[in-house]
A protein has these predicted regions:
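Conserved, well-ordered alpha-helix/loop/beta-strand core segments that scaffold catalytic motifs
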Residues: 1-18
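Alpha-amylase-like alpha-glycosidases and glucanotransferases acting on alpha-linked glucans and related
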Residues: 1, 18-167
Length: 167
């Protein structure tokens, strides 16, 4: 409130993926692709590119988007609603993961053996916009391997992207 009263907007940051040992994953196991013992079956990362011959193996468990869809994305809505009580705009790290994400079998030592998997994209952001009842105050971190479908998703919802001068 103090910053807003001074004409300053705050930009928050939210990663798309959760750490495997986070309370979010532990308390909401059905929302993630985990086995019966709670271990990930697939994990997040990015494919090989000109920065890394083996890609990036982040190791975060991936979402069970079917379950999220069944709940109307309730977990995500709560997460974003709360974050927006702390800031005016929210930068989503790895926005491209809402269009397609790189799924790597759990236990791999590199990201080479991953594959692109479709994410809910338009359905997710349509639900988010309808539920929150206003234009989304989201900044899409659209760096890295970005294809036309990621740009179309970003533009469909009027979300600003990012440019890093160094690149």
């Amino acid at each position: 409130k103090y910053a807003n009263d001074k004409g300053i907007s705050i930009v928050g940051d939210i990663p798309i993926f959760m750490a495997w040992d986070s309370v979010d994953v532990w308390a909401n196991q059905s929302l993630f692709q985990l086995d019966s013992k709670g271990y990930p079956t697939v994990v997040a990362g990015v494919p090989p590119d000109y920065f890394s011959a083996t890609g990036q193996l982040w190791g975060n468990p991936l979402y069970n988007w079917k379950k999220h869809t069944e709940t109307g994305y309730e977990w995500w809505l709560n997460r974003i609603r709360y974050q927006l009580t702390l800031c005016d705009f929210l930068r989503i790290d790895h926005f491209r993961g809402f269009d397609k994400y790189w799924a790597i079998p759990y236990g791999e030592e590199t990201a080479i053996n991953g594959k692109w998997v479709e994410a809910p994209g338009v359905n997710f952001f349509t639900q988010l916009e309808a539920t929150l009842g206003y234009h989304l105050p989201i900044i899409a971190e659209d760096l890295g391997e970005i294809d036309d479908s990621v740009i179309e998703l970003r533009d469909k919802f009027g979300l600003p992207g990012m440019k890093v001068l160094e690149f």
